[in-house]
Amino acid sequence: MSETTGASYAAAGVDIEAGDRAVELMKEWVKKTQRPEVLGGLGGFAGLFDASALKRYERPLLASATDGVGTKVDIARQLGVYDTIGHDLVAMVMDDIVVCGAEPLFMTDYICVGKVHPERVAAIVKGIAEGCVLAGCALVGGETAEHPGLLGPDDFDVAGAGTGVVEAERLLGPDRIRTGDAVIAMAASGLHSNGYSLVRHVLLNQAGLSLDAEIAELGRTLGAELLEPTKIYSLDCLALTRTTEVHAFSHVTGGGLAANLARVIPDTLHATVDRSTWTPAPIFDLVGTTGQVERLELEKTLNMGVGMIAIVPQESADVALTTLADRGVEAWVAGEITDRADHTTGAELVGDYARA
């Protein structure tokens, strides 16, 4: 009688050895993110962070956020470039946390793949680790899940969760904002990580453009433009809180500039942002003109060139701009805070964009 071979995890499409190989490849990158408070190494059941380090706080508040990168991952997949998408993930998570004035402490990641390609997974984690360094936080753990049959062998998605801390009396938000405050815009590095479903639909599906196509107005290939990593503002925002008074931050993500700014404006006040104070990068015009997308639709989908907003007292604006300039962050006064009066929303864009 011949011996039969039963079912196995490997036969079902899950390669544990490939997963182990990926962990070995990513270890050196994870080590580079470590802070003094982190205990243990990669491979434990849980990441450990020594909370006694928070004793210096009078009343520490922990801030947490969870996010992903959205359909930008498909651009990375098509280009075969996996080591930048991690920057986007850290930006989406940690720049949400810093909005309340919190210092990023640590984060974890979740990578879901159809098939574990160890080098690809390690490249993704490399990008996450680099992003963590830029945000000043530690990468204390993560999960790589292989889902054969649910995802194609080249498909993947990434998500992450992070934690930060802020002194209770230094918590930023709507209650600090006053009439006359200046609205300072910080330039985006590009599309960042929002609106890619629209961008892909317009440029790739409707217009049939190739990611390898050289686009004159962009000065590089379309793929390079679309994969440009999201700028991470965490340490720049914290530097701002040390050099001048800050009332609030707003991270410009899904929903656009006005909608995200309105999230931090109290019911009695209104933020007016003047479009004439900046010129959006060519990619925004390319999407708009190619897809005949109305300006308001673009503005509620894309960041239009502004990735982070700081609201500061008018008299602090110059110091704030100097601080950001010293850190290499392009920034400008884009508007002001006024009484709500007859305005039905917390924030609006007015005027027309400056021409290049």
Predicted regions and their residues:
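Glycine-rich phosphate/pyrophosphate-binding loop regions near the starts of catalytic domains
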Residues: 28-189, 352
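Short helix/loop capping segments that flank catalytic or ligand/cofactor-binding pockets
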Residues: 57-58, 72-73, 193-195, 260-261, ...
